[in-house]
A protein has these predicted regions:
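Glycine-rich phosphate-binding loops that contact phosphosugars or nucleotide phosphates
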Residues: 53-197
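Generic detector of well-ordered secondary structure
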Residues: 24-25, 32, 80, 187, ...
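Short, flexible loop segments at the rims of nucleotide/cofactor-binding pockets, characterized by
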Residues: 35-39, 87-89, 116-117, 204
Length: 206
């Protein structure tokens, strides 16, 4: 199979097999992500509304490494819609000093990005926030349905997990389809009122 005019032999020789495949597969995975969001939109909207229907609230996007970049990219697009209540922080900053970033009393939607859903900083971020925040909801966006974040969502009422399809759990050093799908899923999740037509017909979105 040839991808970007690279043969299997060339990709093996240059150790680029995973990276090339994961870049190439992105349009197909985006359509699957759109379909996923369309399938759970009512349940997801009800969960998010517990926060955003309040008079005042915070939406806090958190991740480490490339997962932090997802939040840094998203908050600029989301802020106008949510009256500039969206923030983006590194989970590695929140873990040691959550009180410097999170409100103790304000309703807070903590959106946690984690490719594996198992990293110490992702899990530590959840527990640190629980200690500080009195009115906290977690939205986990992960590429691993078997990860700890996903399992946590199944057992806690204040958690919701968007488990992206297995092929988005990139194996290459560079996060490509995992990054773009976590971005897309979160953008759609926080724009369900504007996206209903498009996510029910994903070819129009893409």
């Amino acid at each position: 199979m040839s991808i970007f005019n690279l043969t299997d032999e060339k990709m093996k020789e240059t150790s680029s097999t995973f990276t090339a495949h994961e870049i190439y597969q992105q349009p197909a995975t985006w359509r699957k992500t759109c379909a996923q969001l369309a399938a759970c939109k009512d349940e997801l909207q009800a969960f998010i509304d517990q926060v955003v229907k309040q008079d005042d609230f915070d939406i806090v996007l958190v991740g480490a490494g490339t997962s932090e970049f997802v939040g840094n990219s998203l908050f600029q697009a989301l802020n106008p819609k949510y009256n500039y209540k969206v923030k983006s922080y590194a989970s590695t900053d929140i873990v040691p000093s959550p009180e410097n970033f999170l409100s103790r009393t304000k309703p807070t939607l903590l959106v946690n990005f984690g490719r594996s859903g198992n990293s110490p900083e992702s899990l530590g971020n959840v527990e640190a926030a629980e200690v500080v925040c009195q009115n906290l909801y977690h939205l986990f966006v992960t590429c691993n349905h078997e990860g700890t974040l996903s399992k946590m969502a199944a057992s806690r009422k204040n958690c919701f997990a968007i488990n992206l399809t297995p092929e988005t759990h990139d194996q290459s050093f560079a996060m490509t389809s995992s990054y773009s799908n976590m971005y897309l899923a979160t953008y759609l999740a926080l724009n369900l009122d504007l996206s209903l037509i498009h996510i029910s017909e994903p070819t129009r979105l893409l």
